[in-house]
């Protein structure tokens, strides 16, 4: 795909050189031309990205003006995708032109949802719509979007249920029933109620003591962690499950502190307690360019001698050093996600609009506009994680057949679209849309 737009860059540059300040929208002759128009929008988008990579900002901004007029958060999946990538490219241009510092993170402004489709993303508009700052990510809104993502798509549930089943399978012969889960990104704890219920039902003898569960939940917000612990404690009480919850606050960028906490956890392990480590949508956050951070982290996890390590990650290569490679990968990945949302949610769904603009839009902004240590979305494909895990002494534990059946049931009952598919490959389970894998879950020991 990159080859095709590179080959046409010279002609595109000639075309954009004469573009007026307020170019007319692209004309679509009939509905039968929609597919052709979508391909044309994508081709223009890649051409604009190529200009940005060459620091040809004038040509890029001319194309982005055209794209902003012909894309919309309310259009079809291609138009909605192009709308977000156009804005992200505009932000990247602004930052390169203004030589802004890279010690910040991306967030959306509150008025982003009401922005006019016809807005041309000049530098001043981009500065209003996107802010790069270090704090105030509005965790309450983030929590709301996360809940919507969990309810409206199978992505989160697929990872949670499959990882849970791997933990249950690995601890089925646990003699004393004492299980300690280290959850490295617990968020709101949505993963654990189904597992807690399964553990409570394991005791077939009413006279035997109920199983024991201890969860150490990691996160950056101590208030949010305490709320999660309170909810899980109340749920455990309703099941008669012996339960303890401990918080482990992770200070952003403080990997050394996290490693110390993990090693202290290994030293304080209760005798006879089975340890499970849950890395669901976490490892990509600490994958730096040279890989040393993830290496230190995996070594620390290995020192816990856990029964099982569960991992769920995106099937995308958003950590590539090359901006153009990363851009191309991101367009294909999010195109599949947007197509899946369009097929499973109503055309005027407010929830879909919010998820695309606020959740996935923020990710797209990070992948496209951020560089070096500032970029948080460093997803890697399964083969990269597989090689990394094996390098540090982990052995792949096959995902069981029941987990596959459970995932099929999840899709059939809650997301009945023919576009979703499951694939069992390399002892791991993949969720995809059409022919593109989107998420993978694997387990290790």
UniProtKB/Swiss-Prot annotation:
Expression across tissues: Expressed in roots and flowers.
Observed effect of gene inactivation: Plants fail to initiate axillary meristems and do not form lateral shoots during vegetative development.
Chain location of the short sequence motif VHIID per the record: 179-183
GO process annotations (BP): axillary shoot meristem initiation; regulation of DNA-templated transcription; secondary shoot formation
Region (VHIID): 146-217
InterPro entries in the cross-refs: TF_GRAS
Predominant place of localization: nucleus
Keyword Transcription applies: yes
Region named Leucine repeat I (LRI): 39-127
Superkingdom of source: Eukaryota
Region (PFYRE): 275-366
Domain GRAS: 32-445
GO cellular component, one term: nucleus
One Pfam family cited in the UniProt record for this chain: GRAS
UniProtKB keywords: Nucleus, Transcription, Transcription regulation
MF term (GO), any: DNA-binding transcription factor activity
Biased composition (Low complexity): 1-21
Compartments where located: Nucleus
Family: Belongs to the GRAS family.
Function (record text): Probable transcription factor required for axillary (lateral) shoot meristem formation during vegetative development. Seems to act upstream of REVOLUTA.
Name by which UniProt lists this protein: Scarecrow-like protein 18
Species this protein is from: Arabidopsis thaliana
């Amino acid at each position: 795909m990159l080859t095709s737009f590179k080959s046409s860059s010279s002609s595109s540059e000639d075309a954009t050189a004469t573009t007026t300040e307020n170019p007319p929208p692209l004309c679509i002759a009939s509905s039968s031309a929609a597919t052709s128009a979508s391909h044309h929008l994508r081709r223009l988008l890649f051409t604009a990205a190529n200009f940005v990579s060459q620091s040809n900002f004038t040509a890029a901004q001319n194309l982005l003006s055209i794209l902003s007029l012909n894309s919309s958060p309310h259009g079809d999946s291609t138009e909605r995708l192009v709308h977000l990538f156009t804005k992200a490219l505009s932000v990247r241009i602004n930052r390169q032109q203004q030589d802004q510092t890279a010690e910040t993170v991306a967030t959306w402004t509150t008025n982003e949802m009401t922005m006019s489709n016809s807005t041309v993303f000049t530098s001043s508009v981009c500065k209003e719509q996107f802010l790069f700052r270090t704090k105030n990510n509005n965790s309450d809104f983030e929590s709301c979007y996360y809940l919507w993502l969990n309810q409206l798509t199978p992505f989160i549930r697929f990872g949670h249920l499959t990882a849970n089943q791997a933990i249950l399978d690995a601890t089925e012969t646990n003699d004393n029933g004492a299980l300690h889960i280290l959850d490295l990104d617990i968020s709101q704890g949505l993963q654990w109620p189904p597992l807690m219920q399964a553990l409570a039902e394991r005791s077939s003898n009413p006279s035997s003591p109920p199983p024991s569960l201890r969860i150490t939940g990691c996160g950056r917000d101590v208030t949010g962690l305490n709320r999660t612990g309170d909810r899980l404690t109340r749920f455990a009480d309703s099941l008669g499950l012996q339960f303890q919850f401990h918080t482990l606050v992770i200070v952003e960028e403080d990997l050394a502190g996290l490693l110390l906490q993990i090693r202290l956890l290994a030293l304080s392990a209760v005798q006879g307690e089975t340890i499970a480590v849950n890395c669901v949508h976490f490892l990509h956050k600490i994958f730096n360019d040279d890989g040393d951070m993830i290496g230190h982290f995996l070594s620390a996890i290995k020192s816990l001698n856990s029964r099982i390590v569960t991992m769920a990650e995106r099937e995308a290569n958003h950590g590539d050093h090359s901006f153009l490679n990363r851009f191309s990968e991101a367009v294909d990945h999010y195109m599949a996600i947007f197509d899946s949302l369009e097929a499973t949610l109503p055309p005027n769904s407010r929830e879909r609009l919010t998820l695309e603009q606020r959740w996935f839009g923020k990710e797209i902004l990070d992948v496209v506009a951020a560089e070096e240590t500032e970029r948080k979305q460093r997803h890697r494909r399964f083969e990269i994680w597989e090689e990394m895990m094996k390098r540090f002494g982990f052995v792949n534990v096959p995902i069981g057949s029941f987990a596959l059946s459970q995932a099929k049931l999840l899709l059939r009952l809650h997301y009945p679209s023919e576009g979703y598919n499951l694939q069992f490959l390399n002892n791991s389970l993949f969720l995809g849309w059409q022919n593109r894998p989107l998420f993978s879950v694997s387990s290790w020991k």
